[in-house]
């Protein structure tokens, strides 16, 4: 199973891979694959030289791309060597799966740490609370004096102008006209 792609890729046995001509079979289960995973498999097949007229085969919900490649061992696995990925459980005689080549600690799907910033959440909460408090205070005063609460805006000569933090362009407008809705 290709864990980073969410699909199975079978490249043949190690002995088959070492031959100059080999059959390559890329498979992906479409029942739980994403568009990105499908694109990755097709992109990899394209990089390996699959002819654009190559027929696709289905076995249930599994899409198979099989082709003969005139490739060397390094053509297929050079990217794995460059990334310096080591085999966790090498299988000498069986097929090579990408699952063997992916380190679970580096797999982005295995990382479940939430990166929520508490300061941002507190700022959002405080902003919403001050807005709601301003509305509630304004509703409690009614339209007496045209005040709809103090939203932290500038103070005029007769007290708070009730413009809010947006100045005369906010929802409460300039002066004592009240809200614009």
From Swiss-Prot:
Bias class Gly residues marks the residues at 143-156, 170-181
- Organism domain of life: Bacteria
Q: Name the segments for region: Disordered.
A: 143-181
Summary of subunit composition and partner proteins: Has been detected in a cytochrome bc1-aa3 supercomplex; its deletion however leaves complex activity unaffected.
Q: Kindly provide the name given to this protein in its UniProt entry.
A: Uncharacterized protein Cgl2226/cg2444
Organism, by scientific name, is Corynebacterium glutamicum (strain ATCC 13032 / DSM 20300 / JCM 1318 / BCRC 11384 / CCUG 27702 / LMG 3730 / NBRC 12168 / NCIMB 10025 / NRRL B-2784 / 534)
